[in-house]
Amino acid sequence: MSAALDSPSRSAASPRRSSVGIVLWAVFLAITVSQFHSPLFALPGRLQAWGSLWVAICVQALPFLVLGVLVSASIATFVPASFLGRMTPRNPFWAVPAAGAAGVALPGCECSSVPVAASLMRRGVSPAAALSFLLASPSLNPVVIVSTAVAFYGLPQMAWARFAAAVVAVLCAGWLWLIVGDNSTLAEHDERLGECTPSKPCAATAVAREEAFRDAALADFFPAASYLVVGAALAAAVKVIVPAQWFLGLADTPWLLIAVMVVLSIVLSLCSEADAFVAASFTAVSPTAQLVFLVVGPMVDFKLIAMQLGAFGRGFVLRFVPVVLLSAIASACVVGVVFFGGL
C-alpha cells in the first residue's frame, strides 16, 4: 500500500511484461485444463495428484488475494500517509501499539507497506511506530484473518491464534527496535519512496485517482499472484513427494519442524491473504508449526528483505530482520502452546 495521495502511482506494466510471470501463468492454466481430463494435457499418477492439489490451493486462495489487493489499492489511493501520522502518538512507546492498531484498520499487502513506512518516517513518526505499521498491516488485517478461518475451517482457533501471535510479534518487534534499533542506518530514498514532487505529481483529480487505483491494484496483484502460483506449486510438491512419515518423524524434535516451516515461509514469499491455504495443505505438521509459518511469512521473506534493502539500506536490514524474526518465532511458539497445547 503506497500513500497514493502522497506518492506517485505505480506502473503495472513491468509485472505484466514479466516473462517469468507469463510462463508461470501459462503452466498454471495448462494444469487447470488437465483437471478436466483433456487428452492434450493428461498427467500421470503422482503428477496428476500434484496438479490437482496445486490448482485447489490456488483456486481457494485467489478470491482472498483479489479482495486484499482491492482493499489495499483503495487505501493506497484514497488515504494519505499524513492521516496515519496524525493517528500516531508522539510518545514512541505508545506509538507502537497505535501503529499496530492502524495496521488492522488500514490493511495492505506486505510489499506495499514498505513505502508507507518510509513515508511515515519522513513525516516525523518514530521509526519504531512506522515499522510496527509495516508489520501489522499485512499480518493483522481482517482479510487475512477471514482467509485463515476459511482455510482452517476444521481448526477454527487457528485464526484467533494467528491474530494473537501477530499482535504479540508486532508489539515485541516495535518495542525491541526502540532499544536496539539504529535509526542512523535508515537510508534516504526520497525520490523513490518519497513525497509528491513537480516531476511526480499527486493524484488530485477523480480520473487520476481512478488510474492510481487501477495501477496500484495491478502492481500488487501480478507479483502476488505469481508468488501464489509458485508457492502453491512447491507446497503441492512437498505434499505429494515428501512422505507424511518424514514430518511425523520430526514430531519428536518440534524445534526442527518449526525451523523447516520458518525456512519455507521465508523462501515461498507468499502474500498474507493467500498463505493460509498453503499452510493448511501441510496436514502432517503440528498446528503450532503451521502457526509459525503464518506469522513469520508476512513479516520476513525474501521479497520483503529485498524491498527493505532498497528502501532503508543494508545496515537497517541486518538489525531489523533478526529482531522481527525472533519476535515472530517466539510469539508464534508461545501462542501455539497456549492454543494448541504444545509445539
Q: Can you name each region flagged by the protein language model?
A:
Residues 2-3, 9-73, 160-262, 321-343:
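Selected transmembrane alpha-helices and immediately adjacent juxtamembrane segments
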Residues 52, 56, 69, 73, ...:
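N-terminal, well-ordered alpha-helical segments
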Residues 56, 60-67, 75-76, 80, ...:
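Short helix-loop boundary/capping segments at the starts of domains
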Residues 71-102, 246-252, 278-279:
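Membrane-embedded helical hairpins/re-entrant loop segments and their flanking transmembrane helices
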Residues 103-161, 242-316:
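Membrane-interfacial helix-loop connectors
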